Amino acid sequence: MTLYDVPAPAKLNLFLHVVGRRADGYHLLQTAFRFIDLADTLHFEARADGAIGRAYELPGVAESDDLVVRAARSLQRATGTRQGAQIGLHKRIPQGGGLGGGSSDAATTLIALNRLWGTGLSRSQLMQLALPLGADVPVFVFGQSAFAQGVGEDLTAVALPPAAYLVVQPDAGVPTAAIFSDPDLTRDCASVTIADFLALPTFCFGRNDLEPVVLRRYPEVSGAVRWLFEHGLRVRMSGSGACLFAEFPTLPEAVLAQEEITATMRVAGKTTSHTHPGFRLVQASTGLTEHPLRNWIAS
């Protein structure tokens, strides 16, 4: 049996506050997650020999460090299944962009192989397997827009209004660990409540506490923020960056902004009097109400 074109959507952190740090070094966060329709796709083919093989390569990521492979092996160990899988992956979500691409791929692997192998784990059981893979993995198994606390595992579903987004990737990759270990990172933001978050338009609420650190360390990102502001876009960083996003009421408005930005970049590239930061990605996306695989799991 084979599962083709299984989606792994990107996420946005609509805000991200660092409210403390545990004794073990993990940071305590408050954030709101929303999925968007920018997505990787995976393919899963069952194997009778129990092996986990990957029919793709990720630059700089060894198979032993690949979250997809680790997720598959974690599900094998937890269930005792003797089945294996050959896995394909088509990347569309930028790596090192703060959009949760690797975490989403891992969650989709848990969900899809649970279905392919017939292992029958519940959502809560899959979320328990997800957390050791990374703090962002559980929300993709949770499958809904969520207000998150703790290290990201304490999730409460929230209903968000329809929205679209313009996602921009500056010409930089940001290692998450380096940002969280920066001595200048603010780690004592006052706690907020879900009611606080829902009382304001989502793009007006809070901030991303990681953003000042990234802007200071990565001129490509700070330059992109300035350039976009000069061209009429107020953006916020997702996760630890480097991707930035602006919110719009409708997808046509986000598409128009995408077209205007790319047209301006083309003009700037042909003249000596104008410059642009050189984006790797400019993508209009729709905010999702839930994960496309949410109904693949028994609650």
Curated annotation (Swiss-Prot):
Disulfide bonds: none
Catalytic residues, chain numbering: 11, 136
GO biological-process terms attached to the record: isopentenyl diphosphate biosynthetic process, methylerythritol 4-phosphate pathway; terpenoid biosynthetic process
Domain of life: Bacteria
Residues reported in the UniProt entry to bind ATP: 94-104
Keyword Transferase tagged: yes
MF GO annotations: 4-(cytidine 5'-diphospho)-2-C-methyl-D-erythritol kinase activity; ATP binding
Keyword terms, alphabetized: ATP-binding, Isoprene biosynthesis, Kinase, Nucleotide-binding, Transferase
Family statement drawn from the similarity comment of this UniProt entry: Belongs to the GHMP kinase family. IspE subfamily.
Function: Catalyzes the phosphorylation of the position 2 hydroxy group of 4-diphosphocytidyl-2C-methyl-D-erythritol.
Protein name listed in UniProt: 4-diphosphocytidyl-2-C-methyl-D-erythritol kinase
The species this protein was found in: Bordetella bronchiseptica (strain ATCC BAA-588 / NCTC 13252 / RB50) (Alcaligenes bronchisepticus)
UniProt lineage: Bacteria, Pseudomonadati, Pseudomonadota, Betaproteobacteria, Burkholderiales
UniProt gene name: ispE
